[in-house]
Amino acid sequence: ALKKSPEMEPGILFTERQFGLLELHSSDLSMIEDTGNAILHGIGAKAEDQLAPKILFHDIIENISDQHSIILNRSRDASILTPGVSLLIYEMQPALFACVAANEAEKVAPNAIVNDIQMMGASGRIFMSGSTEDMQKAKDAITQILSNVKGRPS
């Protein structure tokens, strides 16, 4: 795919037995779509062959304490969780749908802070913080977008 579109920029190549990931970047959306179609053609698949997302868990924790924020921030380099905000935790399968979900959540809650996106492996997680109202909007947007993705049942 990259031979046909050398101006595409590779972002991530993560290999795993069952759930690998190839991330490509371009400012031209049609080039992204054409490259995606070339990859699917190359492996003899179509978009509908993907696994449909499955929602595993979601919750909004209101008014995070300082102790909780310290524990959750231990492995963070940026976008730290601050005491007093609400925290949205959303888990789904396959993991890569966490990227789609986070993108939709940011559209409806632009003031929210994306604290972490775990997008590799079998299950993915999003940790977002902000006002309770924004976290509810984000949760609803994620649920809607994941429910509308076509794919085969897992």
Describe each model-derived feature in a short phrase.
Residues L2-G20, H25-E104, V108, I117-A122, ...:
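Positively charged, small/polar-rich N-terminal and surface patches that mediate targeting and assembly
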Residues I113-N115:
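Short, glycine/polar-rich helix-capping loops at beta-to-alpha or helix-loop-helix junctions
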